[in-house]
Amino acid sequence: MKKNLTLFMSGLFAIGLLAFVPKNSPQEPWKVPDAAKNKANPVKSDAESLANGKALYNQHCKSCHGTKGKGDGPKASTLDTDCGDFTKPAFKNQTDGSLFYKTSEGRKDMPAYKKKIPDANDIWAIVNYMRTF
């Protein structure tokens, strides 16, 4: 009887510890090819581009990345990976080409938007809008 109680309590303790394990697993860095990193954004960041980028971001990105790009959208908590925070230096220090590549190609929970948004200029407009966070 005492052995069964000890096993039961050990099991409960182990389950309780799971509550402290972070949901989002650490991610390996994106492997962005040099050619993609060095690609220049052909879409000027002007009012028209930003309006287009915002509309597309709201349609395709906001549910995970959040209204202000902090990675806190309503779907973010259901993902196995971290959405990232577009307001932090780690994001802001990336090239436009890197952001375009990541948005286009995706990985794991991040969809490859080149399939959903086939016009590359629209993805560049999203990059321009992401730069406003």
Question: What kind of feature is each model-predicted range?
Answer:
Residues 51-58, 93-97, 107, 118:
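Sequence context surrounding c-type heme c attachment/ligation sites in exported
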Residues 10-16:
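Bacterial N-terminal signal peptides
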